[in-house]
Amino acid sequence: MSRSVLQPSQQKLAEKLTILNDRGVGMLTRLYNIKKACGDPKAKPSYLIDKNLESAVKFIVRKFPAVETRNNNQQLAQLQKEKSEILKNLALYYFTFVDVMEFKDHVCELLNTIDVCQVFLDITVNFDLTKNYLDLIVTYTTLMIMLSRIEERKAIIGLYNYSHEMTHGASDREYPRLGQMIVDYENPLKKMMEEFVPHSKSLSDALISLQMVYPRRNLSAEQWRNAQLLSLISAPSTMLNPAQSDTMPCEYLSLDTMEKWIILGFILCHGILNTDATSLNLWKLALQSSSCICLYRDEVLHFHKAAEDLFVNIRGYNKRINDIRECKENAVSHAGATHRERRKFLRSALKELATVLSDQPGLLGPKALFVFMALSFARDEIIWLLRHADNIPKKIADDFMDKHIAELIFYMEELRAHVRKYGPVMQRYYVQYLSGFDAVVLNELVQNLSVCPEDESIIMSSFVNTMTSLSVKQVEDGEVFDFRGMRLDWFRLQAYTSVSKASLSLTDHRELGKMMNTIIFHTKMVDSLVEMLVETSDLSIFCFYSRAFEKMFQQCLELPSQSRYSISFPLLCTHFMSCTHELCPEERHHIGDRSLSLCNMFLDEMAKQARNLITDICTEQCTLSDQLLPKHCAKTISQAVNKKSKKQTGKKGEPEREKPGVESMRKNRLVVTNLDKLHTALSELCFSINYAPNMVVWEHTFTPREYLTSHLEIRFTKSIVGMTMYNQVTQEIAKPSELLTSVRAYMTVLQSIENYVQIDITRVFNNVLLQQTQHLDSHGEPTITSLYTNWYLETLLRQVSNGHIAYFPAMKAFVNLPTENELTFNAEEYSDISEMRALSELLGPYGMKFLSESLMWHISSQVAELKKLVVENVEVLTQMRTSFDKPEQMAAFFKRLTSVDSVLKRMTIIGVILSFRSLAQEALKDVLSYHIPFLVSSVEDFKDHIPRETDMKVAMNVYELSSAAGLPCEIDPALVVALSSQKSETISPEEEYKIACLLMVFVAVSLPTLASNVMSQYSPAIEGHCNNIHCLAKAINQIAAALFTIHKGSIEDRLKEFLALASSSLLKIGQETDKTTTRNRESVYLLLDMIVQESPFLTMDLLESCFPYVLLRNAYHAVYKQSVTSSS
């Protein structure tokens, strides 16, 4: 097979262009990272900033590229010491520059080959060949510009080479050429303009072919709107027709890329601008569109200035310089507005497209081209804005700020999501298209070719066979398609048929090129949807504009109408890894970490914003709930009572206070309250949080809803504790009922969040409220349980001990007593049945158990002190125990007792604490009976049916269960546990038992002394005594039950003994004649009745045998009579 000396098939143009383009991007990545490292003092190679090497570095740079080591020993002495380390650490940098040089050689060789072969280049016909050719030239140009921007390049290369020479006795073999290249490309564009003179014909032909594409792509928003671009519903009759074009791949080709080709390309072959009007118009159009172009990532080129600086030194280029200045002025004044209008149009166009496709995903088949065009157009506009916002004068900054950019990105993400979700739908459509239409048309085209060499015939036959063999069943079976080989074959075929002496020339068979370009697009719809999404909508460039990225996000959150699109920012973080390259693997971790930190930060900020809105709504709702509290109706009642009298006076009364609920009355729908605004803002933001169930960023899965959940938990915890309004200095705290109202209002708002976001708010309640039933939460902070427990113990019960508050059994509450110093709180408002029920609701069984344990700890400390007093009087008490029927001896023994008042006071304190606990337990039982009636009744059955012969351990387990449910027990398990901890190793069990028995004796013989106390008078109205001695009944019974359970004694026998001693002692005061000692005798008699009434072990018959009932009856008559007299 005879061909020309340079056979196209042997030159492998397609393969070389593919490989060199990929390698060029890799080299750019490496140079970019070197430039950034050298610009960062922390990442810069230490040898460049080492003070000891400063003179050596300056010398090397000054002499570069010459190498002089002989006569400069003094300056290079320090270098001699560190040569091995320098060789080791600068090798990566040095050989990157060597790789750039080799890449340059390969590119120059390939460009020469293309020139020699006289390759025909037309973007509308041999798209892949032309695109790759232009990409290679731009990559090569960018690479050399990037190289020239690394200021430390001479120092790095020189340091490495000098170290190499000192180590090996000779320069590195690549150094001479490398050094010369660095010097030659000090001004890269100027050097390349000279270098590209021989390539001008090929390059200008390729660029001129863009005349068919670029002008019709670079239109204004108004022209787009008039053409109804990207609209599926503008022509309903053609909705199902496939979107077709003679230049399919050009339709979604990046405008940004084309502008880069045109601007850099015509700078390199500038001669044609003077001879060809088409080229000049194309170039001027591109110059007017931007102020700068992207070289790589965030590296830009201000091309107006660069071109002007190059042309100013060329004779006869005044016209071109004027053109540049004119275009620059036009770009500065009009480009911002033009692109702003485009973004505005694209927002509505993409919204329409996404909405239609979500409703009818089947349209993704025929209208796939529209989707990728929309993505490409939007991506170009976003990148343009990002690039210019960071590189424009502050005077015109307003044109480059777009508060609605998040909306455009969001619709891009929606379209991307549709393509990923409905990929199989598109596959089915295009598999049928390829086999049923494309294969047939291509076969006819091939059959009609007048000339078709063997190689080309084989390739095209394989195309037809491949497409014909496709079937829908392959899609249904989940078969993985791979048309990469077919696409590479078409690329090869373009190369074979585009050379000047080709037997089958594409210039003569343009229809074949256009048909194949369409077929290639269709194959990509089957096997390369993900790659197509990256090609048309990758926004990984945001990774390198972190400040602008974060600023856009903050603007989005601040604008309520845009906050619903804020999820687009975390979604963009999923793009970042696509900008990495295998030739620079070391940056993967850096970019991956950045994507993770940004995604985390965005989701966290969104959740915080939502949390703050929810908190504001909760605050409003708590205020509204507070208005409904009973305390606020007092003013209304007083106004109603005084209404008549105010009418009679004829004076105008006070204006009526607004009643709760008035905020819901609207005069018209235009009235918007603060609560309305908050709900609107919240619903918008929650839409965003709920949009994506999860997202994968660098193999890490993020769940936006979990961010909101965790923030709600933290804020709910803080709010509950904050709403207690506990002040440690003044000892003020919110009433439990008011806190409960606020908490319920808060929970109602949180429950409504489930209408916006699919989160498990019950889980939040369980986590937070259960933690609040413990002493400390998971962060070690105090909870409402600890705050209320401390307050009731340290404030309320302490004031009871001080005599400022009394327990009123009739009211089942603690009530303030009139004293000189008024208390800062009303005890009744914190201890009545409604407040205790509210407390039980808030603390729950666990919290109430903690409260009980804290109360018992205080009781145990009082019992410990009582035991000490018993030990002090042990001999006297032992004798009194056996002499209760000998009045004279008892009187003598009583006089020898010490600390009688202390014993009674401590027992009263114990009684007060137990009375408070009984209130708390009763409230807990009421609350649990409401919430879990069947479970409470089952526990009650357990407790009521314990056989007397049951083992005490088993009985105590049942009592513990009952106590946790708020049920009263014969023996208090919490008290037993608290007193059991007092067991001493130094005292024998027998001695402990004896002390317990004598304690009961001490209390019994001390009771008569209460009669002399003025405050011991019984009040029938409160069913108790103002000095709380009525609480002794509870204290005596429960302490006896607990102590004798611990010491395995008979509770009943010991209480009988107590009753005998107490009745004997009280009967003696009946014989007393001193009115002072017997002033409240009748009131004290009633204690015996209370003790028996309180006890499950004593009976009235037993009391009758010890103490005549007639005395009790007379005592009741006397105290009631006395109360009537005192009240009258």
UniProtKB/Swiss-Prot annotation:
Keyword line: Cell membrane, Cell projection, Membrane, Transmembrane, Transmembrane helix
A Pfam family that the UniProt record links to this protein: Nckap1
Organism: Xenopus laevis
GO cellular component: lamellipodium membrane; SCAR complex
Primary location class: membrane
Name of the protein in its database record: Nck-associated protein 1
Region (Disordered): 640-665
UniProt family annotation: Belongs to the HEM-1/HEM-2 family.
Signal peptide per UniProt: none
Functional summary from the UniProt entry: Part of the WAVE complex that regulates lamellipodia formation. The WAVE complex regulates actin filament reorganization via its interaction with the Arp2/3 complex. Actin remodeling activity is regulated by RAC1. Plays a role in neural tube closure.
Transmembrane residue ranges: 995-1015
Location in the cell: Cell membrane; Cell projection, Lamellipodium membrane
One annotated GO biological process: neuron projection morphogenesis
Membrane-topology annotation of the record: Single-pass membrane protein
Superkingdom assignment: Eukaryota
Skewed-composition ranges (Basic and acidic residues): 651-665
